[in-house]
Each structure stands twice: as C-alpha cells, then as structure tokens.
C-alpha cells in the first residue's frame, strides 16, 4: 500500500503554487557579468574529492520541517527551517557524529520562501535566501558549516518555478539575450512532482545557460551537495512533460563547469526503467516516497519505513561507487520523536546499512537518546554500509520472515534476519541459502559479540518488526547444484502457463503466464538422500509476487518473491522443500494470484 505521505506531498504542492502572482521578479536591465572563477574551499572545509565514492552520511532538515511533533514548527508548516536551527544541528553533528563519518548538513525545501511560502528570487530568476529564515544569506551559512569541517547541502525543485517567470522578461545571468521566455516551452507546459514549475526546453541554448547560472551561484556560495526534487519519470508523474532526464543531464554538465565537486542527488520515487540515466548523470537517486509520516512524530513503521523491504531489492544491483540507491532519511535517534519501537529503529538502521543507502538522519541531533546514539554510531554497522561489500538482497522468498545477505570479499557473509510481522516470530538463516553446509562462525554485529559456531543454520526469535545482523564465516563445505530448466519438455504446464523467450535466462527461455491457476511442475528432480533442501529459484518479476511451492503433491507453502529490476532481469532466491531419495516433483503454483515468471530451479547436491 502506498505511503500516506503522498497526499501531504500534494498539500505541499498547493503551498508551492499558492500566490503565483506574488514576489514575481520584474525585468532587470542588467549587464551580464563574467562567470566567477571556481569557488575556493572555505577554511576548515573538507578536501575536495569525487562525490559519492561511498554512500554519503549526514543530516537533513526535512524530517523536522515536515513533522507536526509539538514545538518543531511553531510558526506554521515547514517553519523549522531557519539559519539558527540549521547551524544548531551542524554544531551537534560536528560534536557527536562527525568522527563516525557523518559530514553533510543538507538544507531542504523552503530556504527561499517565507513562513507563508512566499518566494524570493534574484534579478535573474534564481532562488534567493528568504531574509526571515536566512538573514545573512546562504553563503555565510555554508561558510559556518565548513568551519566545523563539514559539507553544506542545498535544495531545488526541478524546472523554472512559475513565480520566477516574470512574464518571460527576466534576464538570465551571464547569458546575453536570454530571458525566462527563452528557457521554457512556448506553451508554458508544467513539470515536476507538484506541477509547480515550467518545463525547460533544452532544444533552446538559453535553458542550459539558466542551469549553468544556478550551478555557478551554488558553487560561489560554497555548497557541496544539491538535492534536485520532483524529478521524473517518477515523483508519481508520467508522460513527456514529467521526463526530466534532460534536466538532470544539464545539471551534471553545469556542475562540472563550476569546477566544484558538488554531489547531485535526485528525488523522489524515481522510475527504475531510467536507472541508466540516473547512474549516468547523478550521484544518488531516491527509490521511494518520503519516509516521513507528516504526523505527530517524524516517521511511523507503517507509513513507508516498511515499504522499503519490498522496494529496495530490485534496485540493489545498480548501487556502486559514484551512485547509490537512496532510501531516504534514517530517523532513529530519538524514540519519542521518531515514533518507533526500539526493535523498529534497529531494523530501520539495519536495512539502510546493508542496502548501502546513504545514511543521513533527520533527527534533532541535540536530543538524541542513548539508544539512538548507539544505533547511529556503531562502527561495525557503519563499516558494512561504507565498505566494499555489495548491497544485500533477500536470499529467501518467505514473506514477513526474511533473510537478506551479501557475500564479502573474505568469503564471509553479511546476514540480516527480519521479522516484518506484527507479532513475534522465529527467523532462520539456512546455510544452504548461502551456498554451503556444515558449520559456520556467527558474530552479532550490533552487539559486537561472537556467538560461537552453528551447524547448518541459525535461528532467532524476533519481536514484531525486529531484526538481527550477523557476520557468518563458513567453516563447512561448499556444494554444487543441479539445474532444471523451466522450459524442459519433461515438465508439466497447467492452466495458462506457457513457454516464452527470455534473453537473460539461462536457457534463453522461461515459463510465464503463471496466473489464476497456472502451474509449473518440475518432474524427475533427483537427489541422493531424503531431507530438507533450500532450492534456488531463478525468476523474473517486475513487482513482488506470491507463489505456492510444494513437492511430491504434499502441502504447499505460500511464499513471496521480491521484485526484480524489470521483466527482463533474472534474480535468484531459495525456497524450502522436503525431498525424498530418488525422483521428485516440485510445483510452482500461482493459486488465485499472479506469480513470477520462472527461469529454472537448482537443487543442492548434498
């Protein structure tokens, strides 16, 4: 179910588009000046390097801006955002979290708008600091952040904001002959997630020059990070007007021209079908809607924290140095303000860490509780997020009781157990799912405790929404698997099930149309000895889908398969089955639902 934050995003759209006739810049007869030289780093600023070699860490203002927690926004919605509050959080970040790798202080939406959301622009259609929120302007704020050895981040919505258009006569900085009429489409078509801006027309050279002028302004101010929001395809918008790939490309080009290494993060709920574009032109991309609940706390488990368990797997393969899958803020620092149980807070932080998401908190850093500090500063957990280990993915298809894993370069495995159910439950990580049998040494990452040696599996009783995080080091033996192709003529297809082409599949074919009674039965699955087997299922599924798995006509187990990136990408999970010595059947049944397409199964040779 989609997060209830979406209607609140709509309310923000109303705020963004309210009073469109106010604060519109008049045409300014200004002679364009030469572009400034690349901005030098302020004293105390971290050394420049290529952005996003690791998932970034820091703080964002939006979680507190968007919350109705008592006292956070005393002057109306989103009023938390002020120079005083930003610098207070920067001071707390430097004192408490900087030594653990947190370094970005990111100013989100509204820095150019007053408490009634009336905007400020300079004489060149660029956002300007609201004097009530940021009386000294934005450069002194960045300078103060740099003086603490931190990096400064800022925010913009994509497109030319409607209020900045000024009848089309506003001159573009350092672009002789260009006005706002020359940067947009002549029909003033709108764009972004709120339709609060006119879409830029990059077939017109002035559009790139407008982006260049904004990027140079941020570089001159000393900003190190830009969040570009409302980007599509995504942000709950589709169609040509909301395709902002050209905007993101223009921003990448403009940032490069400034000579300043500015991290470009794009948002929100971006379309995975354009992931190649996001990777090419940006350093990070929000894969989902806001994590905030827009309620009396910062977040809630059901709002959208739990959505990430469904949405993150299909993006995992795309994360790499230079660009990361952004799951949004980690609001785990103060239980009362966050609105989560301790178990939920640990699961939240665990998923973000193993998924290699940027780690940026939206909490009030001056009010962190002891448990929140322990979550945000656990060096072993941070090392998983910041190290060379690839993002973890689910290795089992088991619904609310999930096992995620990533194999480390030293042969060990990062393994997370999650119970997403509303009641307590046991969760088991079976070594077969990790590719070996026998013994393994298990270390509890959160508690920094060696738990000893476990044979074949580890099982933990977890509370509702609880988790455990382990490093599992095999001491047993690896094994081979015997593969059985779905399209084999020895199999039995029932209902609508049919064989289709699949270029990514192992045999270039798959079995699909497994819906509403469609079944695929693998025949003559041979094992030497009877017992419990974790069978690999390679499948294709553009969204998370259920299926029922059974062997030899026995009772079926209902399972849920995580989404793959699209309907052309193959992923693999393991499913538990009981087999007898000799020949067996394994059946994948859609039941009354829609199941994934199947490439093949692979059975351990034990």
Positions of the model-derived regions?
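Secretory targeting and sorting signals
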Residues: 1-36, 40
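Glycan-recognition and catalytic regions of carbohydrate-active enzymes
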Residues: 356-421, 496-508, 512-513, 523
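Extracytoplasmic
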Residues: 425, 434-442, 450, 456-606
């Amino acid at each position: 179910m989609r997060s209830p934050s979406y209607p609140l995003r709509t309310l923000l759209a109303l705020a963004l588009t309210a009073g469109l006739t106010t604060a519109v810049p008049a045409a300014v007869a200004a002679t364009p000046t030469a572009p400034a030289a690349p901005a030098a780093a302020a004293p105390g600023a971290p050394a420049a390097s290529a952005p996003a070699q690791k998932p970034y860490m820091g703080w964002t203002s939006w979680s507190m801006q968007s919350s109705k927690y008592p006292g956070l926004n005393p002057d109306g919605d989103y009023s938390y955002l002020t120079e005083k509050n930003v610098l207070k959080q920067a001071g707390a970040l430097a004192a408490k979290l900087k030594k653990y790798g947190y370094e970005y202080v990111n100013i989100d939406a509204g820095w150019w708008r007053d408490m009634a959301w009336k905007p400020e622009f300079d004489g060149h259609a660029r956002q300007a600091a609201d004097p009530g929120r940021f009386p000294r302007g934005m450069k002194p704020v960045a300078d103060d952040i740099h003086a603490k050895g931190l990096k400064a981040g800022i925010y913009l919505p994509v497109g030319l904001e409607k209020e900045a258009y000024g009848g089309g006569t506003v001159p573009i900085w350092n672009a002789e002959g260009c006005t706002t009429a020359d940067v947009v489409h002549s029909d003033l078509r709108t764009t972004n997630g709120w339709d609060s801006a006119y879409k830029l027309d990059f077939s017109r050279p002035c559009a790139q020059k407008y982006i260049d002028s904004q990027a140079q302004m941020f570089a001159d101010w000393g900003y190190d990070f830009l969040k570009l929001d409302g980007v599509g395809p995504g942000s709950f918008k589709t169609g040509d007007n909301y395709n902002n790939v050209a905007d993101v490309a223009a921003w990448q080009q403009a940032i490069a021209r400034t000579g300043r290494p500015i991290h470009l993060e794009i948002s929100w709920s971006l379309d995975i079908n354009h992931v190649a574009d996001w990777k090419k032109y940006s350093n990070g991309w929000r894969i989902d809607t806001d994590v905030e609940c827009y309620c009396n706390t910062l977040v809630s488990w059901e709002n959208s924290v739990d959505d990430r368990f469904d949405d993150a797997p299909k993006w995992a393969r795309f994360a790499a140095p230079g660009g990361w899958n952004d799951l949004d803020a980690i609001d785990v620092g103060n239980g009362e303000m966050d609105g989560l149980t301790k178990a939920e807070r640990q699961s939240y932080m665990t998923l973000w860490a193993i998924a290699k998401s940027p780690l940026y908190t939206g909490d009030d850093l001056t009010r962190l509780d002891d448990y929140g500090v322990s979550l945000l500063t656990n060096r072993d957990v941070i090392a998983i997020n910041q190290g060379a280990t690839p993002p973890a993915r689910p290795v089992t298809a088991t619904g609310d009781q999930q096992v995620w894993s990533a194999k480390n370069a030293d042969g060990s495995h990062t393994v997370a157990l999650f119970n997403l159910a509303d009641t307590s439950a046991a969760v088991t990580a079976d070594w077969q799912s990790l590719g070996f049998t026998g013994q393994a040494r298990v270390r509890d990452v959160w508690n920094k405790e060696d738990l000893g040696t476990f044979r074949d599996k580890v099982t933990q009783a977890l509370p509702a929404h609880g988790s455990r995080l382990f490093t599992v080091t095999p001491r047993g033996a690896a094994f081979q698997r015997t593969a059985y192709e779905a399209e084999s003529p020895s199999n039995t297809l029932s209902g609508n099930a049919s064989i289709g082409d699949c270029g990514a599949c192992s045999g270039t074919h798959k079995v699909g149309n497994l819906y509403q009674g469609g079944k695929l039965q693998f025949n003559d699955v041979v094992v030497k000895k009877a017992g419990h087997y974790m069978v690999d299922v390679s499948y294709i599924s553009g969204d998370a889908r259920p299926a029922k798995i059974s062997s030899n006509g026995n009772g079926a187990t209902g399972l849920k398969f995580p989404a793959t990136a699209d309907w052309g990408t193959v992923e693999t999970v393991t499913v538990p089955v009981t087999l007898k010595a000799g020949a067996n059947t394994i059946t994948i049944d859609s039941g009354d639902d829609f199941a994934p397409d199947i490439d093949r199964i692979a059975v351990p040779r034990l």
